[in-house]
Each structure stands twice: as C-alpha cells, then as structure tokens.
A protein has these predicted regions:
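A glycine-rich beta-strand to alpha-helix segment
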Residues: 104-134
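Active-site catalytic pocket residues across diverse enzymes, especially alpha/beta-hydrolases
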Residues: 39, 133-137
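Short glycine-rich anion-binding loops that position phosphate/pyrophosphate groups of nucleotides
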Residues: 27, 53-55, 78-81, 123-125
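C-terminal helical cap/extension that packs against the catalytic core
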Residues: 60-116
C-alpha cells in the first residue's frame, strides 16, 4: 500500500506536461502557498497563467504567487463559476488579462522557451489545460 501511495500520480497535481509547462490544481490560498514553497528552488524564471472560480480568495493567492514570479497573467475558461474579465476588475491594473487561456499559455511558452510556465488557480482549469496540452506532446 505504501508503494502504491508513493507511485500515485494525481492528474493536474504538480504535473509537468513538458519540460516547460507545469499544471497544478491549487485552488485556495493554502494550496497556493504549498505550491509556491515547492517551486522556490526552481532555477529558472516562472511565468504564471492563473484562472479561478469567482468564490475564491484571489488576492491572497496572487500575493503568494508573486513570491516566485514577476509575470502573472489572468485568464478565464468555459465554466459558469469561472471568473471572467469583469470579475478581475480590481486586479487588471496590476495583471494582464487574456480572454483565451490558450493565448496566455502559448504566448508564455513561445516568448520564454527556456523558462517554466505554471498553470494554476483551479483544479478544473488545470485538468482542462492538462488534457489539451498533454495531447499536443
């Protein structure tokens, strides 16, 4: 049983889709803090693509992500609870918004090919990105 737990890879939980694309379903402040702590020793710049549901404490999550990245972009995805551009209005002065998350991810991957692109903020969003980008490998 112990070995089974050690070898259990949960989809979209600290999962590298490629050498430069990491998806994680961290979707609340405590989970984001743990994710940030796991990434503090990464020896390359990190670019964050963030999307979450409207009921989440976005401010605490963005502050924590700022500890590991100077490049955080906000986006949305197709779900009735997902934050859209209007829901991010308090943060649009500090963060760029992409209506299409594919554009946000592809822009980061293409402009920073040697860096790490982190997708997080919602387990649903992370799983969506995982399923789409894993098939492109």
């Amino acid at each position: 049983m112990y070995e089974g737990l050690l070898n259990n890879n949960l989809p979209a939980r600290f999962e590298y889709i490629s050498d430069h694309l990491l998806v994680d379903g961290a979707h609340n402040p405590d989970a984001i803090i743990e994710l940030v702590n796991s990434l503090k020793n990464i020896n390359k710049p990190i670019h964050v693509v963030f999307a979450c549901f409207r009921d989440k404490n976005i401010e605490r999550m963005l502050i924590s992500l700022g500890e590991i990245s100077n490049d955080i972009v906000l986006t949305t995805f197709n779900h009735n609870r997902a934050r859209n551009e209007e829901d991010y209005f308090l943060y649009l002065g500090d963060y760029k918004f992409y209506q299409d998350y594919h554009d946000a991810i592809d822009n980061a991957l293409n402009n920073y090919p040697d860096d790490l692109v982190l997708v997080c903020g919602s387990l649903y969003f992370a799983e969506l990105v995982r399923s789409e980008y894993k098939n492109e490998k």
